[in-house]
Amino acid sequence: MARSLVIVGAGPAGMSAAIAAQARGARVTVVDEAARPGGQIYRQAHPALKGGDFAEASERARKERLIGAFERVLERIDYRTETSAFALFKTGELHIASGSRTEVLRADAIILTTGVREIAVPFPGWTTPGVMYAGGAQALLKSQSVLAGRRIVVCGTGPLPIVVAAQILRAGGSVAALAMLNSLKVGGWQLPALWSGRELVREGLRYLATVIRARVPRLTSYVPVRVNGREQVESVVLARVDRRGVVIPRTEREVACDVVAVNYGFTANNELAAMAGIAMHHDPPRGGWLPVVDEFGHTSVAGIFAAGDAAGLRGALVAEAEGQAVGAAAAADSKEIARPDFRAGLAVALAARERLSAFQSAMQQLLLVPSGLWHLPTDETIICRCENVTLAALRDALTAGYLAPNTIKRVTRAGMGWCGGRTCLQAVSALAELHGAPSAAMMTPRPLARPIPLASLANRAAAGRS
């Protein structure tokens, strides 16, 4: 009998896994929160809206190829759009919600391809309307062809701020400044790894060329330290920092703008994996707390797999290659996987994953957040937006000896709000470390892993499934 699979997420890893598993005869269900496939990197506009694609031609070609291949198998799989997976248990029960209805899915295998989210570093004024993630500004362009503002300052680390600044310019927007925390200079020892990802390097250089041609002011080793404006962003103050992330005195520059788009790297969407009791390990450059997996995505819980950025930040190309390998493994039994011809059939995907992972490892040095940045917030700065927990309240708890994330959550309510700690967890953990907490600790995830309508739970209870 064909094996049944549920894949959570329809980004590059999820789509690739679905294609590979269906090709091996598996009965595949794909659950995704978006209305169309693609994930964050290959985000498409909602069918009722018109979005724009301001990416490089080579990236658009990869997107069209993979989404096209996924759409060709849609008639043979169960594809659940606009559906949230909000709980997963080691028994293999996956709880999902769509509209005002909930359902429990069970399958021979579950593949988590839940991706990553952006890291927030609080600073005075970061909750002012007009301050947003750089990825959020990019999502507006991709999904609706909407510019986030009239005059945008893009800040952060790694390649994404450059990409977002270039795409804003290509969409006809105005970038008032591009402030980068880290230099893009690399050492000679990294050249072989960069060569392995030369297609991505070329794309990055073309994005940078767009910014240079537009004569956008570019600042290196600068970060936003304060936003001015009560009801809306009016300007941002940028300051230079040293290698530790500590602000250098008398280096402040004020830039007039109505939007500040910030990215300080990414952390894995690991709530479902942790909730299921999967063994986790801590690897900050690759996304923080990650499930322990083998080369075919097996986790410590039988029948649950992880692939793509959810198993370690390595980008869309690695996610696609890994999704193919993990999808094939999840559709097979242990005897099939042990056969030499199984690995031989995946040789191209496994080689691509290894080659491109080397490139991403070289890039990860650009995504590290230096400890000095966590000193940017003042006592009045809100750390947990959902519960309005300020740095002063958090510091009182830390000074009293409450250093474990779960204890901080109970004492201050930081992480108890609508987002479940997804926005503030990095900041809370980093600030706790400054007070002597262990460097590797995480909040215990609880259902609901994603916000869902109360009507969904009410309807479930009314049907006798409390």
Predicted regions and their residues:
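Residues forming the flavin
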Residues: 1-412, 417-418, 422-466
